[in-house]
């Protein structure tokens, strides 16, 4: 929602009335229209997409059980869906199309800022959890209790972080230049008076820059730098499959976050250094409009990156559409039948292969006895083959942990 800085020195208890003395420039009007169009697209595409992914993840958790990655993924999809649920009300309010009370504005503001904060924090937690999997030689899952405690603390921190929004969000009635009230121009805004700009507003913008911008970038970069060095020691097939997935994930995140962090840093500087005339107030609103889009774009691409591009999630989604995940017992029974059939086919194939191998060995032995020849060479695959097998045994730990990390990144 918009941030309004009013050139007064005290806060009135009544509903603030703001005179429209600063005309909306053409660039600001174009940016606000573009913001409304992009947000509408995100709502109609990202909302159903997050709902489908969240329902699929919840049903998969119910059927196959929970794990630390799936708990984090479920929390990420929930926060994104919650953000996109309140976004239509904020968009309509910004366009002066939805009158609201002060209580409803404060409620929507708290939900919006807390869900966005928890969403960014969950992305960092997922990166930290994947680092923990690759860094430890033996992968021991942390207890679900500690995972839930971490998420509860994250939500608590998100609610505390959104307290300035609860305090300073209000309804502002926009008046014309003649002081007369304009019908339908009552909007939900973050309202700050002049004395609060260099204390409350500046401090909050700096915190937004750190929590929403810098911290997730640092966590993601730190994890994937270690991830890249680990992938170099994996097999070529595993390396290619995992690097493709991780490269798309990291490039998409950094491509959004790098401009966002730059805009937020510049916005904090503008709040502290620029005067409060009409020109600079309009520029502040323009910068704020640009920075508001990035969290919404994350809500759109997160289900694509973490779910639809993840391992085995599309199969789970098809099973969800067919209703196979609704009955847990029937699903597990069908999985057991498929596993038993596969094991039977594998055993039959191994038996036929062993028979063919024994026949081939017998024929070779007969030929050797017939030739009466003696060889002092090592049999094929004894010393050299054993050395290669031992080397492979010691090097399978990294691909195994890498496979776990790639599988758990998708949360399924």
Curated annotation (Swiss-Prot):
Gene Ontology, cellular component aspect: host cell cytoplasm; host cell plasma membrane; membrane; virion component
Consequence of gene loss (knockout): UL33-deficient virus displays a growth defect due to deficiency in extracellular transmission. In addition, UL33 disruption attenuates viral reactivation.
Virion surface topological domain residue ranges: 1-35, 102-106, 169-206, 266-292
Segments in the Intravirion topological domain: 57-80, 128-147, 228-244, 314-412
Coiled-coil segments on the chain, per record: none
MF terms in GO: G protein-coupled receptor activity
Residues annotated as transmembrane: 36-56, 81-101, 107-127, 148-168, 207-227, 245-265, 293-313
Subunit note: Heterodimerizes with US28.
Family to which this protein belongs: Belongs to the G-protein coupled receptor 1 family.
Full protein name: G-protein coupled receptor homolog UL33
Name of the gene this protein is made from: UL33
């Amino acid at each position: 929602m918009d941030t309004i800085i009013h050139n007064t020195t005290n806060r009135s208890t009544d509903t603030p009335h703001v005179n429209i003395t600063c005309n909306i420039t053409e660039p600001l009007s174009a940016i606000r229209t573009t913001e409304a169009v992009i947000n509408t697209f995100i709502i109609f595409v990202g909302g159903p997409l997050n709902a489908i992914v969240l329902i699929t993840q919840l049903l998969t958790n119910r059927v196959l059980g929970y794990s630390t990655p799936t708990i984090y993924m479920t929390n990420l999809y929930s926060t994104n869906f919650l953000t996109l649920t309140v976004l239509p009300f904020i968009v309509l309010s910004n366009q002066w199309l939805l009158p609201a009370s002060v209580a409803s504005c404060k409620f929507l503001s708290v939900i919006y800022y807390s869900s966005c904060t928890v969403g960014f924090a969950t992305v960092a937690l997922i990166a930290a959890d994947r680092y923990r999997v690759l860094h430890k030689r033996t992968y021991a899952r942390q207890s679900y209790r500690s995972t839930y405690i971490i998420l509860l603390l994250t939500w608590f921190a998100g609610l505390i972080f959104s307290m300035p929004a609860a305090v300073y969000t209000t309804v502002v009635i926009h008046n014309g230049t003649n002081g007369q009230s304009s019908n339908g121009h009552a909007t939900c805004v973050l309202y700050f008076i002049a004395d609060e700009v260099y204390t409350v507003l500046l401090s909050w913008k700096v915190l937004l820059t750190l929590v929403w911008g810098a911290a997730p970038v640092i966590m993601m970069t730190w994890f994937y730098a270690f991830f890249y060095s680990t992938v170099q020691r994996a097999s070529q097939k595993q390396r290619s499959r995992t690097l493709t997935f991780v490269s798309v994930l990291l490039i998409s995140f950094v491509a959004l976050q790098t401009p966002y962090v730059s805009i937020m840093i510049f916005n904090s500087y503008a709040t502290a250094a620029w005067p409060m005339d009409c020109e600079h107030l309009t520029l502040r609103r323009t910068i704020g409009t640009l920075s508001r889009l990035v969290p919404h774009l994350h809500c759109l691409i997160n289900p694509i990156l973490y779910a639809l591009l993840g391992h085995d999630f599309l199969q789970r989604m098809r099973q969800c559409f067919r209703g196979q995940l609704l009955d847990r017992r029937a699903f597990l029974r069908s999985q057991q039948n498929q596993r038993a059939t596969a094991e039977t086919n594998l055993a039959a194939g191994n038996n036929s292969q062993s028979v063919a191998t024994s026949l081939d060995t017998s024929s070779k032995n007969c030929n050797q006895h017939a030739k009466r020849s003696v060889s002092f060479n090592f049999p094929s695959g004894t010393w050299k083959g054993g050395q290669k097998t031992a080397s492979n045994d010691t090097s399978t730990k990294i691909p195994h942990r890498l496979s776990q990390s790639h599988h758990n990144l998708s949360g399924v």
